[in-house]
Amino acid sequence: MAVTNIAELNALVERVKKAQREYANFTQEQVDKIFRAAALAAADARIPLAKMAVAESGMGIVEDKVIKNHFASEYIYNAYKDEKTCGVLSEDDTFGTITIAEPIGIICGIVPTTNPTSTAIFKSLISLKTRNAIIFSPHPRAKDATNKAADIVLQAAIAAGAPKDLIGWIDQPSVELSNALMHHPDINLILATGGPGMVKAAYSSGKPAIGVGAGNTPVVIDETADIKRAVASVLMSKTFDNGVICASEQSVVVVDSVYDAVRERFASHGGYLLQGKELKAVQDVILKNGALNAAIVGQPAYKIAELAGFSVPATTKILIGEVKVVDESEPFAHEKLSPTLAMYRAKDFDDAVEKAEKLVAMGGIGHTSCLYTDQDNQPERVAYFGQKMKTARILINTPASQGGIGDLYNFKLAPSLTLGCGSWGGNSISENVGPKHLINKKTVAKRAENMLWHKLPKSIYFRRGSLPIALDEVITDGHKRALIVTDRFLFNNGYADQITSVLKAAGVETEVFFEVEADPTLSVVRKGAELANSFKPDVIIALGGGSPMDAAKIMWVMYEHPETHFEELALRFMDIRKRIYKFPKMGVKAKMIAVTTTSGTGSEVTPFAVVTDDATGQKYPLADYALTPDMAIVDANLVMEMPKSLCAFGGLDAVTHALEAYVSVLASEFSDGQALQALKLLKENLPASYNEGSKNPVARERVHSAATIAGIAFANAFLGVCHSMAHKLGSQFHIPHGLANALLISNVIRYNANDNPTKQTAFSQYDRPQARRRYAEIADHLGLSVPGDRTAAKIEKLLAWLESLKAELGIPKSIREAGVQEADFLAHVDKLSEDAFDDQCTGANPRYPLISELKQILLDTYYGRNFTESDVAAVKVEIPAVVKAEKKAKKNA
């Protein structure tokens, strides 16, 4: 049934829709059979279709259209015959993904008069390959040729098993019918090839569209180019089908030193150099009413000369206008779609590229540009040209008409007769259109657990008296210069001498930096880094508790990488492997050794450090496995004289490390055992270590080991909101870190032990709330529960043990009892809550907190109350930045 009106078009769409629904269920084997049969039929009809196109449109050259028809069938088939376009495209068992292809549906194919048959063949074939249907809106000047090409492909497809109405067309095209087709509700995609007006109409239709537009291809010929090849290529391309290919050359810009040689070569090989009145006459016929004169499109050079009122030999290949102006006032500077060519002289390569940029911007932005140069010896020019040209195809030493369509002069450029121009040209794609653009891809993503890790120092030496033995490794590894980083107390009391004496005896030069204080500052760290830069150690030894080890780690970073920006190092991350800022590689200049003299921080085995900017008061918590020491020395002889308060605070810090690591969303079977063993050692030995001190060296040693074991656990499983809040309490009110954790941990357990939390932290392996069960497992492991106890009872017994332990270690019952004034606390609690939420530790907590919930925990802990869920709803949080903005808005109003 012919399509000549809206009703007939609607009926066609209905038939095509039915056919496409059937075709959408075909297998890859069936589709490939149809694709091959259709390509064979189109190739077989290449000559009659070419003759028909020229006869009907009055444009182009039969022999060249034969090549285009052959290309559209043979090259397209060869390029895509093995491409999977149906069903499962790929399956990745490792990452658990399946990619499935689905057809788009019905495509509206817009076909230009310049390439009426080859474009129809191309679009039909890629539609068939992707299980789509297509309805063509041909150009009125070439409708019969376009529709015949479509019919040949359709009949071959039907003979190979395709549904009978899979390809359709408008028999009597009009603007009304073309618009109706583009806007039809059953059209799923517009595939438009044509001039700017048609492409704009496609993109304005409200439908997904792939459209291409005008080209205004400039060619730069530099002084290193092979002139004979350059001229031959331009002539071959520009005369191909009388220049109707949109990628064909429109201007040549020649460097001055070879301009005359290029000019002479054109003149002696069929190029006609327009002189005087001839140039003006051709300029006058190129444009008509400010637009390209359709009368010259696809016409031979001698006919265009006749239109201009003069004659040239019939053998003339192209008309060349030597012009100077590079703007819209110059007709030769426009796209001409005919064997007419502008020729510009450039003073040098840079000037030539600048002119080419302007020509592209005038009317061919996004399409194609070309450079003739010595591509083997001028890579910088090739790169520069590529950077400057805003075109999707940048061809080197290539005839643009044949090169732009792909697979002829470069075999990785996809073959296509629809060339995307990207956003520059108002297109949605910037590559040569192919089957991949006509399918929807579905991704089936199976749940997969994150790859986890267990990272430790290369060596961990432990047991009483291990320090001098472990230092033998420094000597045997050939280190010659050791920088010891410690605090003044340890230095004055001879702890550093225990290291320097061993090293000096072996001929290792030593230097001691002992200015580290609690909460190390950037100024102190920079001072230590300056010493490192002058002393040039090949090993840095941190001696002390958390502060000297933190300072030493950061000095290590500054020594190895002085260009480091701490704001970037401290940037929060959701996944340490995907962080925006990548830590630099460490250990190039020096090895890091950590010798711990306290039992709590675990810093000797962790990738964490904290530094305070003393100019702003801003704390920078750093976390990266690059900061993990190369060696840890855990010698309990160094903690025998540790004061009771430090024993208590450090011990409860270690308890908190183990508790938070065990319930963390990153907890694994590798970290669980260490967390549980650390808790067992601490339960059995911390009271004795606190009460008996050096009189019970076994208890002191086991607590010391437990702190390091807990450090290993949280180095890999990370921590939670107890540490998030403790960091902020310590910073604001100068509460010792271990004490802050001890004050908060019971209420944090009450908060986390909820099987139906407000929000669960999103982490693949953490598939449901587990904290409640895991706290109960801790109680079981510590022997706190009895057979028959329910989960709630086990958690209460765990809390009872913690409260009893804290009481025995002299821990205050509340933040208020720890000496924080109520007015001061309440003035800062909102900011503390927000800052705790933003702490790096928060992300691994099993329960993703609301800021109001953190505020409630802080308030309850301040007053010594047990946290309960029901209290949270009444809590209002005033975020300082928001309050400030609201006040400013009211003031401005």
What spans do the regions from the language model cover?
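ALDH superfamily catalytic-core signature
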Residues: 3, 121, 199-327
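Rossmann-like NAD(P) dinucleotide-binding subdomain of oxidoreductase/dehydrogenase enzymes
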Residues: 88-229
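Glycine/threonine-rich beta-strand-loop-alpha-helix active-site module
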Residues: 78, 84, 149, 523-637
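Carboxylate- and glycine-rich phosphate/diphosphate-binding segment that chelates Mg2+/Mn2+
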Residues: 260, 268, 605-717
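Conserved C-terminal structural/oligomerization subdomain of aldehyde/semialdehyde dehydrogenase
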Residues: 24, 310-450
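ATP/NTP phosphate-donor binding region
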Residues: 452-539, 815
